[in-house]
């Protein structure tokens, strides 16, 4: 009894000791765990604060990036609108330039055709000019031969002044005008008077469209009427195809003293008179027959 009781007591003591040791171990372990947990919580809290600060910075950066993205989107939309407007503007300019180029090409073609026409016309005019120069040279040779023959037949001893002739060239629209000058016949008994005659003809396409003859000279006053009649008769006699009613004759009389150095003339001697005869014929009148041309 006593042994079993003793063993029970010993067992109870050991159990108490074990329980106490377990409690102390548990308490120490718990305390260590609490300390470790507290340290870990502190670290976690610091990490949390750092994470919160980092999150705050990230949120700030995100907000800044969001604003920048919106600004870039606005810039993108503006650039797209500007690009679209530029495309439309340059498209319109391109269309205008294409129209201008097309017009210039047409104008260039017209200019080329005009140049070709002008070259053809120039060639035709050049050929016509050469032909007319040949005809003029032929007429000049004929006139020179006629003048040589006419003045060679005049008897010597009388002081004669050679009639003057003039040749003037001019252009009428769409035609080439050739002017031919020749001297008309002077009555034999007035050959000692100073008389000059000039006849001008304007020829269009081989037809005479305008003709004028002018003769003037200084004669004695008493012979004015006689000279005028002689000139008129000689003119129509030399040109039988003309009719008096188709020709306009005009006589201009000018008083002119033969001796200009004298201030006064004698009363018994009348001063000489300058007489000018002008004939004009329109295109409706038959043309004067030209002399036949021979080489």
From Swiss-Prot:
Coiled-coil region: 1-151
Domain IF rod: 1-150
GO MF assignments: structural molecule activity
One cellular-component annotation, GO: intermediate filament
Keywords: Coiled coil, Intermediate filament, Keratin
Family: Belongs to the intermediate filament family.
PANTHER family to which the protein is assigned, alphabetical: KERATIN-LIKE PROTEIN KRT222
Annotated protein name in UniProt: Keratin-like protein KRT222
Taxonomic source organism: Bos taurus
Organism taxonomic ancestry: Eukaryota, Metazoa, Chordata, Craniata, Vertebrata
